[in-house]
């Protein structure tokens, strides 16, 4: 079985799930799977994927896992008590061949948000591992280890990068569970203090690494349906987050509606309240410069704020960003696919995104054309109008 622990997921799933329990326990949602890599035939592996998901749905949290979560300063005891009773229910997920053909599959997750939020990351990891164990039956781990050594060598070679730290954000698109663990341990041993930790809660617990993460796009997307007014949905999301965490976990995600809309909503109050912001689409250098100017315009010292970069990073790009912004602010870098799925094979660009909440469409309007995802064109057009966002010529968000 690929997934053997419900902790084998990203930390932000638990931080968001706690908000859902306390503030939105009645919300119902729908998620859909999408493979952005052309020419990939996943249909032959549907039965294997279903078997693995069935195994996932048989898991429960152990006492050791619950005790680990309980020790986190921002996790509340009633949430841990809820998790003690929790398991994923197979009735909320369907996996079928897509009517589009071309080897595509449809994965639809639909049900109470509280009971479906933990599907996304392990299901993506399952799809990845099932695909690669069938297409690469003798993985070239030697090549993977050599590439990983070169990355560690590159980052650790120059003294001026001694304070440049990276984190593992690679659970969802990892080559395999075994390889992911080896990568995390190799980074820990090879980088020392330059390895900040991992988003994966299971490996953080098992190997005493720092678990990392705050919020994901789905949280702010759901607020489109849960908030009092669509135009105020991003502000509402940040306010509800602050209500739950009271200044903890203070990294705001900036690209659900694009950078312009984010800066309009991220006023002086939020600039001072939140520790920083995370970049996940668009030009990271331009984004960073705009964030620093925005902090200064709102009477915040940028040197006290954290800029988190997590969009398709590799080590050279991390180093370029570090050189640009060091000593101007605090920095954090989350590297995903380039760490956990770089053995010489083309990684799958797969996502599972929320598309509906309480029966109404929700959407992400990314700063990167092609990363948006919505199955309702009329709603997407309305959302762009409400937030004053022009439609990129090459962005087909419904695909």
From Swiss-Prot:
Chain's role: Catalyzes the synthesis of beta-nicotinate D-ribonucleotide from nicotinate and 5-phospho-D-ribose 1-phosphate at the expense of ATP.
Catalytic activity: nicotinate + 5-phospho-alpha-D-ribose 1-diphosphate + ATP + H2O = nicotinate beta-D-ribonucleotide + ADP + phosphate + diphosphate
Family designation: Belongs to the NAPRTase family.
UniProt modified residues of type Phosphohistidine: 217
Matching PANTHER family: NICOTINATE PHOSPHORIBOSYLTRANSFERASE
Keyword Ligase: yes
UniProt-listed Gene3D superfamilies: nicotinate phosphoribosyltransferase (3.20.140.10)
Keywords carried by this UniProt record: Ligase, Phosphoprotein, Pyridine nucleotide biosynthesis
Protein name, per record: Nicotinate phosphoribosyltransferase
Pfam families: NAPRTase (PF04095), NAPRTase_N (PF17767)
PTM section of the record: Transiently phosphorylated on a His residue during the reaction cycle. Phosphorylation strongly increases the affinity for substrates and increases the rate of nicotinate D-ribonucleotide production. Dephosphorylation regenerates the low-affinity form of the enzyme, leading to product release.
């Amino acid at each position: 079985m690929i997934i053997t622990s419900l902790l084998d997921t990203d930390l932000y799933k638990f931080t968001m799930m706690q908000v859902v329990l306390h503030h939105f326990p009645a919300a119902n949602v729908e998620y859909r799977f999408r493979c952005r890599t052309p020419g990939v035939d996943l249909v032959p592996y549907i039965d294997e994927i279903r078997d693995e998901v069935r195994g996932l749905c048989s898991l429960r949290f152990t006492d050791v896992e619950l005790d680990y979560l309980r020790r986190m300063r921002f996790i509340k005891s009633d949430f841990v008590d809820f998790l003690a009773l929790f398991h994923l229910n197979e009735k909320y997920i369907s996996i079928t061949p897509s009517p589009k053909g071309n080897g595509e599959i449809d994965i639809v997750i639909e049900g109470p948000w509280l009971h479906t939020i933990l599907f996304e990351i392990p299901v993506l990891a399952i799809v990845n591992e099932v695909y690669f164990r069938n297409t690469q039956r003798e993985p070239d781990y030697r090549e993977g280890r050599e590439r990983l050594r070169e990355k560690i060598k590159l980052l650790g070679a120059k003294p001026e990068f001694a304070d440049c730290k990276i984190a593992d954000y690679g659970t969802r698109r990892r080559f395999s569970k075994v390889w992911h663990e080896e990568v995390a341990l190799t980074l820990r041993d090879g980088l020392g203090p330059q390895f900040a930790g991992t988003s994966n809660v299971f490996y953080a617990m098992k190997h005493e690494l720092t678990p990392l993460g705050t919020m994901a796009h789905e949280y702010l997307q759901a607020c489109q349906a849960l908030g009092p007014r669509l135009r105020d949905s991003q502000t509402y999301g940040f306010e509800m987050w602050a209500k739950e965490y009271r200044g903890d976990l203070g990294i705001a995600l900036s690209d659900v509606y694009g950078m312009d809309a984010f800066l309009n909503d991220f006023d002086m109050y939020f600039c001072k309240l939140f520790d920083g912001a995370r970049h996940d689409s668009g030009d990271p250098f331009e984004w960073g410069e705009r964030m620093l100017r925005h902090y200064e315009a709102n009477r915040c010292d940028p040197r006290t704020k954290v800029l988190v970069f997590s969009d398709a990073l590799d080590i050279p790009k991390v180093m370029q960003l570090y050189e640009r912004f060091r000593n101007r602010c605090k920095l954090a870098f989350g590297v995903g696919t380039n760490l956990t799925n770089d053995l010489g094979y083309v990684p799958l660009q797969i996502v599972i995104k929320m598309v509906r909440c309480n029966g109404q469409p929700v959407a992400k309007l990314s700063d990167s054309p092609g990363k948006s995802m919505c199955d309702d064109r009329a709603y997407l057009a309305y959302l762009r109008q409400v937030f004053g966002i022009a439609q990129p010529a090459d962005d087909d968000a419904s695909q």
